[in-house]
């Protein structure tokens, strides 16, 4: 990979100049977060095919960029996701059951079924909900950072987006505002090579996405997005600079969307299997596992136990979430106004008075 920050070498050793020097507990926690995201994705795609959830957007291949970036942020920082970052919410403490309730839109869904599946929110973890249109979260993240700066808070905001979002007007507006007002924003672009069926080569004429930051007056850095330690290092440094008042940073994590865009997509219709195989050889999970093994922290026994543990956790969460009924029908009208106005109450009363099947 050309001109991209890399920490983990092919043999599992690390570049001593860039290694964040994790303890065993830190390294294992990062690997667990990545493994949880991978196993969850595979299980949720299977549930969708069985008709037990309506929609799912997997993150296969992007676990290092998601978990590595999220773990680099302080607990008081904010995370503004797109639709592929449940791993970021989970490493912040979101219970699996709560995530499953959102996917199923049941009575314990934090947003009462008002959102699409995969549009998670975790308030305790400062993890914002999202809107489906690509790129709309970028101005929101910059606004949160601007508010932090006005309040004199030493915090930072991490916002995730993909290569396709760099073609939107909201990307320009957010980057320009962040650069002019030096907001404490870390822009994490998951360049996974494909925006549904559009390759990154058709998104931009620039050599890299990271260099776009130059036009807005701040730094951009390109990292190997299949290397969790590289993403962690770049995000940690960017967040530190943001808290110190040095302004935003654009981090381009060069990664690959190994699976479909969503459960409604068939990537075999538009991309070459040889390309997929090339990127699968760089899979971030075996790579991080090799790092753990090189450090003497991992073996096949621990791997088997971890997979079993995560699988059991997901099974329990699914079973618990499926026992919960759907939301009460009147919640359709909830959370629109702080106090329901007369016209909406009238509509609700009329709706609830309709005969039910």
List the predicted regions and their residue ranges.
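Glycine-rich ThDP/TPP pyrophosphate-binding loop and its adjacent helix/strand module
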Residues: 126-323
